[in-house]
């Protein structure tokens, strides 16, 4: 029987698979994977995923649904996602508030224009996807470097989408920090403007300091102290939510990542410690 409570998670990456399979029970509360990277995967990787899914709850963070795209939603792909989520009893499914296809796959997460028209477009697609998947979706605030056309602020856009789509928010704390530095707004004021009830999970990750006013979200380094401080503020405002440490590149030994997940757990305990059900 899997534990009913989630707090501290780690991204499931193929490069970590041998160490994750040997990881002690309770080292983390859950693992998060991108379903696109594991659907129909067999062999040693498929067996490894099946073994981990028996030992740890699995959550999913999608990469290619392209909720903001202009092409029709891919219903066959959504069927595959739903089957994967059902097979592994996934309780939390999230996707990026972005688009990644336009007459082909772009292999990047592009920001959606901050307009009323875009709000209506993406909210309708989220509602249809939620209906097809028979579960709620948490959309993630993305990092972006070239600001899209904006008739409203990023905060106003996110709030409008959450309201019209009636979906949840995966709050990426590092992305808030990166965008605040790059686009000149206050990260804490941004968090204060988000609706508490919509935040159901969080991400935290490292970034690269290209310049004092240019941060790059890399997922390739340890979490920086300024981001830890912003995460503490997020816990204070939104309560303890399932939080994933993301690390995609320059993977260190698992023990180093578990030092960071232990810090997440300690901070969660200091901000109320009531686990998320």
UniProtKB/Swiss-Prot annotation:
Name of the protein described by the UniProt record: UPF0276 protein PputGB1_2003
Stored Pfam families: MbnB_TglH_ChrH
HAMAP family from the UniProt entry: UPF0276
Family: Belongs to the UPF0276 family.
